[in-house]
Amino acid sequence: MAAPPVTPSAHRRGQRRRRWPGYAAGAVVVLVIAAGVLIWAPWRPAPLLQPTGLKAGTATTSSVMFHWSDPASGPPPDKYQILSSGKLVGAVAGTVTSYRVGGLAPATAYQYRVAALRGGKRSPLSAVLTVNTATPPVSAARWQGHWSVNIKIVKGADALRGKGTKGWVESWHASPRCPTGPCTVQLTGDLNRHPITATLTRAGAVYTGKTKAKIFQCGKPADAVPIKATLTIQITLRGGQPSGHAWVASAWDGHMMIDSPYTSTSTFYCNAFSLTTSLSGSF
């Protein structure tokens, strides 16, 4: 009997599927290219995008607010960090795209950057945003500190004799009678080499007050007697500037009336006279 024909056993050639680390057998990694834009498959970690679109918002004399755009694609980050001068100043949840900073100085520029965080990783920092606190009115400035005061006689100088009768410079000090902000001021200093003290009340940017002081002498130096004059002072603040977190006066001017009464002794006398002076204060 003839032997049966011999035929090879049929075997299906197996297809080897490449397994990607971290994914189960049968999973397929897909990178779709649509209209030239790469779209990551949902099982791949979404890229952590740099925050963009920073814009200034509402500002007050002591605070600023700014905001930025949502991520262009993918989920929001876990949170955002806010930095100024390289230092962390705050953080918000990843669903929040605005931030307010308080306790700032008035009329001052500040710079901020934002970074996104997810899974312990941080995105590149955003572009720098410069924001400015609002400038208060001059009337809100606190008048304080030492001042160099330029005094010029604009009327009545003929009643005086000696050098410097047309004008001179004195040193005055303004001491507010409140812990912060503008208020009544005690003014101290010298006038014609004699001390003066005056209390000036405030009305907006204008301060007014009266005082008496012995600033002139009647008679020759050997037997002169003091003249007790009445000083009427009016000061108007002309500028302000930040000092720390306060808003303080940076310049002022005004005028002072000096009314000297008739003064006499048993051997001589001085007629009454009045002077009108201009005042200008600077640091």
Regions found by a protein language model. Give the residues of each.
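Pro/Thr/Ser/Gly-rich low-complexity, intrinsically disordered linker/stalk tracts
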Residues: 42-76, 106, 121-136
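Hydrophobic single-pass membrane-targeting/anchoring helices
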Residues: 11-45
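Short beta-strand elements bearing conserved aromatic residues within extracellular beta-rich modules
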Residues: 78-82
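Tryptophan-anchored aromatic micro-motifs
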Residues: 138-164, 186-191, 207-211, 252-257
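Short S/T/G- and acidic-enriched coil/turn segments that sit immediately N-terminal to beta-strands
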Residues: 95-99
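Edge beta-strand at a domain terminus
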Residues: 253-283
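Predominantly extracellular/secreted and cell-surface proteins with exposed
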Residues: 164-239
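Beta-strand-rich modules
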Residues: 101-121
